[in-house]
Amino acid sequence: MPPAYQSAFHKIISRDKGVFEGHNFLVSVDTINWIHVNTLTITEQGQLFSSDSKDNHYLLLQSLQSCFIQIYPDSNISGSGKSSISQPPPTTSTRRNLLRKSSNLNSSDQSHSKSSEDNEHQPPAILIKTFDNDKLYIRIPSKANFGNLLSCLMVWQNLKPQGLAKKWYCENKVIEGFNPNAPIYELLVCRFKIYGPLPNKYKNLNIVPGPKAPVYQQKMDDFKANFDNSYIITPQISSDNHNSINEGWFYAMGALNSHGILNFISELDGTLLYSIDIKQILSSEIREMHNSIFNSSNILFIGQLKELRYNNVIRTLSTLTPDQLLTPFLTRDGKIIPNNQRILIEFPLHIDLEDWFVGLNYFAKREYIGSFDNESKLIHNVEHPQLYDFSKANFRVSKKMSIDIIEAKFENTETNKSGKIYAEVRMWGFPWSRTAIVNHTNNPFWKEEFSTDLPISTQMVHILIKKCSFNDSSYSTGDKLIGTVYVTPDILTKQIKTTSTIMTSSESSQAIQMNTVPLSSMASNSNAGLDIVRLTINDPNNIPIGKLLLEVHLQEYHILSPSVFKPLEKMLVNAPMKDLIKFCNENVPSSDFERVSLVLLDIFQSLEVEDDWFKSLMEVELVNVDIMTRKNYHQRNSQDQAVSNSKTQQQSSHNNVFNTLFRGSSIFSKSLEKYNLRIGQEYLEKVFGDFFAKISNEKKNCEVDPRYVRIQERALRKGKSIHEATGLENGQNEDVSDDDDDDDDNSSDDDADYNAEKERERNERIKQMVEENFQNLYGYVEEIWYKIYITSNDLPDQIKLQLKNFRTKVELVCDPEDKVTSLNCLSAFIFLRFFCPAILNPKLFYLAKNHQTGSTQRTLTLIAKILLNFANRQEFSPHKEPHLVRMNVFLRKHTPEIYDYFDKLTGRKNDFNEKILDLSHEVKRFDLGLDKTSNELPTTPYLIDKYLRLTEIVHLLDYSKYVKNIGNNNNGSMSNLGTPVNSPSRDMEREQDRSRSRSQSGTPDLDPILNLSDLKLNYENKYQIGSLEFEKSEFLELTGDNETEGFIKSLCKGNEEIFSFINSNITLKDIQKQSTKIMNKIQELEIYLENYEFPNNYKDQIIWDSFTDDIMNKCWLDTSRNCLIYSDHVPSSNNQYKKLVDHAFSGLKLKFNDHQKLNGNSTMNSLINNGGMGNRNGHDVNGHNNNNNNNNNNTGDGYNETDRNQRLSSTFSTISIGSAIKPNTSKNPFKKWLRKN
């Protein structure tokens, strides 16, 4: 029995799979010159060909993927592509003239009645506009060809064009097994402060003061530019001045339930304020707010970013405005609450933010690059599968961007500049970061870095230079805009060498359609490898007013599904960490130590083996120390005293080496430094936050250097403030101080006695100032050391554990009598790399709102210097810093305490200090109970994206990029290829090369891959997405499979020791092989997704039928332009859009050559409702029996070319649309519209 189809469109799409062939058409590229073609053909590759009577073929359109389709019911076609419906109806005489011009009838002396009759029988036309902006008009005289061609074009509209970014899609992973009838329970509950609409009756709300949150400010320039160039959309502009939503900060209870609904509940009476359906939010719309916006690092943004959503849309397939893409955001009892499409949540602790960030992203729509392939299968067994029930070949995209705003230089020096300015990073109409507020000079300086994750579709970033309008010490939504800087795709992709989702200007034809903005003019840079660029600042009138110096860095990685990384995870847990460290030391430039160290730290911390990682790092770092210690011990116990005496100077140099241990940059020092700052960030905030605010507010003078105090005293005599005097001490206005000295000298010649007395008074006053400043400084140092000392028990246990292990390791390799080196090493990490950087630059660690300048910065510098000397147990010398010698009193007084402090941190003494900070790391973390789909989400704590980091290590360990070099020199060391010239291991490698050339034998201990053949990879062209030959599990990979694990254990007869040996006997080469394998899969998938989509990607008929249903369910007719669009949802209140399956064509008065109108329910409605009737009744166009052909149709997509034409016309036959057409093959149906020539 033949399958039942909902409509003729369903049947044609399901059967023909985008292939078309029809006869007798008129085509044109400008609606003026029309050409008759005998045959039109659409191939399986999406190419549109025409053929003439001599069987000559011509390519009309190269690719139909994501093409724009517009229908012209009559002949009123203009070159601009506007539909006749969007224009006033022309008069009879006007229509007659247009038809005469476009048709050029063979007989120019036809009567008026004949011409009028011809005009009424003009067939409809279809405009095809490809994604690459090629246009073609086609006039179609036959109903059968019209229906079949339109069905075919609908298939190609839903196939994506070339480019990775075009394969963007989003999906809810949780909905796949979602049961709406399942009991609702709460996953997360928290009391927090939110910024959102205040309910009308908010007496029961705990409203608190706070900074006003910015609302959406439109910056889009081309919402009006539609793909068909026919309509001008003027969106409503939302600004602060017209914001009528009453918003504010208030406390509320938040509850995220198991159905993905976030409820906000009044904490006083328990009433529901409003709710958000997180399942309607994109994952890129849940974002952490930068500390600079609200002076808090615990604020989360949740909203609908209309510009971001608009950029995700392929414009050829949609005419929806940005506002129409939004869904109801805040609701209460099914009613929409007026809102600004975003709320802000401030959590009490950062660990709360981390838990909620993961929980919200669990329900949100996750974004991928992907497409269906021949291995797409049903994820769940359902009776009537939808397209989203099938798997895709996909990967996640991570685009981490960092912008370091250094300084600006304004060109117009004549303008009187005063007040304060700052820079603001803006995306999608919202600010996401701000610099500190500085003086408005010709050359303002910031040097502040902002890092964030860019969504897939984001191609550009704006940086606004603003001037404070109301308060020079705070930001305001009404601050004046001075200029704008555009960070364009060309700048973002300077260092990306692989396939990227960001399209540069040279690839604009393939880029996502986005806002057109002026390109910034870059200054010539001789070193293209540098990230530092100088971009033009344009004022609101788009006139250049200066340059902004900034450093832009973007890293893009394509991340496969977590299952691909399981074997690699198993290997890294049991990895030979020392070999890995040696590999990094030999192949990673010192400039990349910090980045690679953080990657490795994140990996091993997420795998919960960071303790083993740090132990290996320590042992590798201390090897040279151990060797040096042994040499010193041998020299000290040598029988030859003469030799011993001659080595005295060398031993002294060795002692200097011990004193400077771990003061430089290495993978270990960078890893432990990052680890301590990550774990101890909250500790620093609670210990130092109030202290820095106190120093900034009190503004006490702590300068104890008499030279600077003399300058301050002189400035005070001139009536200047201490702040201005501090400007003098920092090197400003040096000429003024010199003039003062000259004045003093000149006056001293006139009256020596009087000036001598005055000078004595001045010296006495300076002495008093120094004493007063010393007491201020001493008090601050006492206070900060007291805060550090009494909170030794509050320092996170993770930090203390690493310091304990570190001290033990150092003592083992040092001389037994050496009690100094280990303490100096502790000081290098706990003070030099932890406390002192936070003191010197509080804003960098979010401990202060603005940069510390003037006397405050000088005070902090002195405090850090004193603490560092104190930690090193080193007194100040009268020869170097005589003004700080008096602080030796503090050092001697508290020396026992510093020893006691180090012993407590490293577990040598019991710490009986009471815990007073109540840090969040003491709070027990609970399991959210999420399913396996949460594996790809960041891990808690610290929101580590484990699979991003594994992808980065795969790129680091992959050797396939060196294939050419290996082919040229098979005997060369692989490590040499990646080792920088300034690497500390280069000398050792050169020595190894010389030894290798002499002996022609011997390999490094690491046994690096000398030839790619060592990897034993099969490079035959058998890589196919899904069936991937290289995915076949090798022995080591089998440990990642539970069933295979059991099988191996059974082979080992249950011997756990043998199985553990298999699992732990991993070499670096094994990890490199696995990395190369994953890298190959990423590259293969990139190539596949970079290409166009084709119908043959849907191999299975079941998935093709689901694809057909998906096309018809999303297809709408925009009646204002008569074009087809595709969307999951269209505003129900808008009558502009009609669903195709709901008789959308009934309003089009389509006229064909048989004088029958496709109008009303009797014609086109029968096309929708009675699809395939002709075949089911067993008749062809002429009414003849066609049962054999019908039986062939039931076989699915298999049919031969000989009956293609007959079958193409059978579904849209005259019987299926309820009318009869008399065939007329003897005459050309377009004869009366063709020109004479």
Curated annotation (Swiss-Prot):
Q: Which residues form the C2 domain?
A: 381-503
Pinpoint the Ras-GAP domain residues.
Answer: 637-905
Please name the GO terms that the record assigns under molecular function: GTPase activator activity
Q: Which residue ranges does the record annotate as region Disordered?
A: 79-124, 721-762, 969-1007, 1170-1204
The molecule here is called GTPase activating protein BUD2
Q: Provide the species name.
A: Candida albicans (strain SC5314 / ATCC MYA-2876)
| Entry-linked InterPro entries | C2_dom, C2_domain_sf, Ras_GTPase, RasGAP_CS, RasGAP_dom, Rho_GTPase_activation_prot
Note the site residues: Arginine finger: 663
Q: What induces it?
A: Expression is increased in low iron conditions.
Cite a single GO BP annotation: maintenance of cell polarity
Q: Where is the composition biased (Low complexity)?
A: 79-110, 1183-1199
Record keywords, A-Z = Cell adhesion, Coiled coil, Cytoplasm, GTPase activation, Virulence
